[in-house]
């Protein structure tokens, strides 16, 4: 295992206290000024990272020394993370920024086992930590002396004088009673395997145009705000053994892509429809949230579909950016995601180790990151009943490209397992100090792992999802449940398609994705445009040059569709930022007994 670089930074608290100041978090009474001093002790030959994997901060609070341990939240972003914004003329601009060496951390105060700190180290230190049961905030002071920071209790932030914000959820989608009943039944082996498997939510974040205007028409300001909140969201769900990773951030910098209005119900419906018909075509993800600067009617601060996770339309939520203090908005985001994960509002009898819990119907200013006992039971019951599959997919070891850190809950190169710190680990199979399996253990996690041993060969670990899928079986030699599917070329969808890598791609299905449920495949004459070799028709590209289709391959180039809403009988989907989007998908049936492969219509009996 690669040794983690440890960086010590001393925060010397000068004997100076302020009585009142206006900070990014709002008006603050009673704060301390501290000055970070960074002390780096690099091992010989080590490469200096911009943001280290692990850091310590030493400083005084109320005259008492504290040590804050931080570890980079390496799973905050997916490996293929992208950002999208729009030019003033409406042109979509998508980039794939490097987020490997980001500046967002989780941590804890020394001698406290719980992860309770969320810190951004991008431009100074900004975030919060818990000390002796109280929340403290730290943020840079915008002074000529750039090293000055303010440390203050959360209770000393003046709260905005307005009615308490509430969640608008009133069981607005799935029936809740059957979920409760399901928790009373005995678990099947498949349900038990599902519960034991690690869970991941791949999150698509959208900021509306009012958010863009609110933060000075600055993409950087909006991005920073969203990142700060996502870091806290990730921390909150770690307590539920769910890892939230941001796959994409889209900022509506030119105009809103839906009608965002004070009616939260109407806005959620519009966003859910847009997500299903547009967003899912851009990139695969599990859940989408819209952050808006609009004021919803009444006290509503957010709305989500109860139990909607993994559904193309209903795995959505909307949240109002209702407070300057970003962690209060992050809690609202966690609350709405909790609804998507099958958790209803807490009743009066529900409790957690805080004054208020995440799923309270009224959003508290107490800033609790804890789910109640009721929430945990309801979430478990929802998982047992529905077993949503999208949240089982996790990054592979090689997806995490920075040096491994034992104790960060990610199994990385050189590690057998990672169950957190020795103080928090509850895994009987894993040695938390070394991230190696305990003596006699064969595995610690995986659908083919049971009580630290591999399940027997032939044991079903995942049921077939459709006609092109196959039930997956354990090998007896691994904890992994290897995905299997029907061989390519097998007829599917009533002979309208052929199986391809576990799916059944058809032109009609692709047309409805781009042009709606009433769309159809265009007449053959439209596909003759693929003979041109330009934006409107080609079969493949060589060194960015579009190559025209051969006559026998025209059904394997640009997809042409017709729709009642379109007068033109030959419609294509074209995006300058992603020219290949809108091409006929590989494996699609192009003639009887033939399917598309690399822009050619080939016989399904040959490998493709």
From Swiss-Prot:
Give me the residues that bind Ca(2+) 1, please: 405, 408, 410, 412, 415, 418
Instruction: Report the active site residues.
Output: 336
- Motif D/ECD-tripeptide residues? 467-469
Instruction: Give the Enzyme Commission number.
Output: 3.4.24.-
Q: Which UniProt keywords apply?
A: Apoptosis, Calcium, Cell adhesion impairing toxin, Disulfide bond, Glycoprotein, Hemostasis impairing toxin, Hydrolase, Metal-binding, Metalloprotease, Platelet aggregation inhibiting toxin, Protease, Secreted, Signal, Toxin, Zinc, Zymogen
Q: Which species is this UniProt entry from?
A: Deinagkistrodon acutus (Hundred-pace snake)
Full protein name: Zinc metalloproteinase-disintegrin-like agkihagin
Secretion signal span: 1-20
Glycosylated where?
501
Q: Where in the cell is it found?
A: Secreted
* Subunit comment: Homodimer; disulfide-linked.
